[in-house]
Amino acid sequence: MTQENKELLLRDLCARLPYGVRGERIWTAPVSGSPEKGIYVFDTFDINVLTTGYYDCGEYGFREVRNYSFKPYLFPLSSMTEEQKKELDKKFHVIGIYWNNIKICYHSEGYWDTDLEVDFQDWLWLINWLNKNHFDYHGLIEKGLAIDASGLNIY
């Protein structure tokens, strides 16, 4: 994984921490040397290992983790359900949802306007909503940094 992709993945995952994003963790255990794989909720353990390559073994000190990776389960924007679209439509009028973006109109004074600028608080609301619903808005699935959760029962 390139440093650029590693930083992109880490920034994306840190924004998702409050929402309990699950993913596939693969690593070689430092004590036994055996490979381990499983589905985990991303947490501070993963941040530590992704950034330093080590984890705390308590009385044994820090141990190096080899071959570590974490791939979150995310949904492509195109997999948004009708219920999710209705929830999003309360704040924005969704014109189209594409594999790499959402085209929206902004609601103002009783009508939908494509020319109005979306204010900062609304963008924050949208990003938090996308994180809460585990949507891939960074293109991580396409880059092989995340697993497409469509059709999987992981949440």
Locate predicted features.
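Structural boundary micro-motifs
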Residues: 1-155
